[in-house]
Amino acid sequence: MAAERSLWVVGLCPGSRLGRVVRVLLLLLWFAARGGALYFHIGETEKKCFIEEIPDETMVIGNYRTQLYDKQREEYQPATPGLGMFVEVKDPEDKVILARQYGSEGRFTFTSHTPGEHQICLHSNSTKFSLFAGGMLRVHLDIQVGEHANDYAEIAAKDKLSELQLRVRQLVEQVEQIQKEQNYQRWREERFRQTSESTNQRVLWWSILQTLILVAIGVWQMRHLKSFFEAKKLV
């Protein structure tokens, strides 16, 4: 999850039927892999951040639980209830969209409004508990993006859906999420194109500037040499 998850489809003709089918299949495989669980270690005063690429208008749910290292037992034990976790989420424009204090185990939810890289940061409030300061925490984190964030068992019970109706709803939401992912990939391609054009333009202007500088230096050297020869009465 800390690493960027991206999909680039190359070597296919955009207008061909085979190309469209392969694109959809690859998107389905990539979409099925979205979300995942991991654990990491942090000091109780340390801050750990992750980058998650998220399309716009997409729900994200994160579940976490913390364990505190017991030096006597030399193993991780469930953290005390007083030890909380502060969660902060920033959008690609560095605006804070979630900043909240949770307990030692909890769940946070947010919806993206801008496509791009979202920063998810966690750190404990252990500075309030000098007894635990300097200890080591193990944080188990599970982040689900888009359709994977939905609890379909709860939805089926709440809306009284049959198995077929629930399956249809899942497929509809998967298609909607795939469309969001496709739009996001197109947005990334457009951004990359703009960056490439801007870079090429800067390289061109820099080359022109270098040429003008070389011409100016050459003219100055010629005039300087001419003045030198005239002063020496060599010409």
From Swiss-Prot:
The record's InterPro entries line, in alphabetical order, gives: Emp24-like, GOLD_dom
Where are the Cytoplasmic topological domains? 223-235
In alphabetical order, the GO MF annotations are: syntaxin binding
Q: How is it modified after translation?
A: N-linked glycosylated containing high mannose.
Sites where N6-acetyllysine occurs are at 160
- Name residues in a coiled coil: 154-184
Q: Where in the cell is it found?
A: Endoplasmic reticulum membrane; Golgi apparatus, cis-Golgi network membrane; Endoplasmic reticulum-Golgi intermediate compartment membrane; Golgi apparatus, trans-Golgi network membrane
What GO biological process, any one, is recorded here?
Golgi organization
**What keywords would UniProt list here?**
Acetylation, Coiled coil, Endoplasmic reticulum, Glycoprotein, Golgi apparatus, Membrane, Protein transport, Signal, Transmembrane, Transmembrane helix, Transport
Q: Which stretches are Lumenal in the membrane topology?
A: 38-201
Question: Could you list the residue ranges that cross the membrane?
Answer: 202-222
Domain GOLD: start-end pairs: 47-145
GO cellular component terms, alphabetically, are: COPII-coated ER to Golgi transport vesicle; endoplasmic reticulum; endoplasmic reticulum membrane; endoplasmic reticulum-Golgi intermediate compartment; endoplasmic reticulum-Golgi intermediate compartment membrane; Golgi apparatus; Golgi membrane; synaptic vesicle
State whether keyword Nuclease applies. Answer: no
Query: Which residue ranges does the UniProt annotation give for the motif COPI vesicle coat-binding?
Result: 228-235
PANTHER family in alphabetical order: TRANSMEMBRANE EMP24 DOMAIN-CONTAINING PROTEIN
**Role noted for this protein:** Appears to be involved in vesicular protein trafficking, mainly in the early secretory pathway. In COPI vesicle-mediated retrograde transport involved in the coatomer recruitment to membranes of the early secretory pathway. Increases coatomer-dependent activity of ARFGAP2. Thought to play a crucial role in the specific retention of p24 complexes in cis-Golgi membranes; specifically contributes to the coupled localization of TMED2 and TMED10 in the cis-Golgi network.
Q: To which protein family does this belong? A: Belongs to the EMP24/GP25L family.
Q: How does it assemble?
A: Monomer and homodimer in endoplasmic reticulum. Predominantly monomeric and to lesser extent homodimeric in endoplasmic reticulum-Golgi intermediate compartment and cis-Golgi network. Probably oligomerizes with other members of the EMP24/GP25L family such as TMED2, TMED7 and TMED10. Interacts with TMED5. Interacts (via C-terminus) with COPG1; the interaction involves dimeric TMED9. Interacts with PTPN2 and SPAST. Interacts with STX17; the interaction is direct.
This protein's name: Transmembrane emp24 domain-containing protein 9
From which organism does this entry originate? Bos taurus (Bovine)
Q: What taxonomic ancestry is recorded?
A: Eukaryota, Metazoa, Chordata, Craniata, Vertebrata
Gene responsible for this protein: TMED9
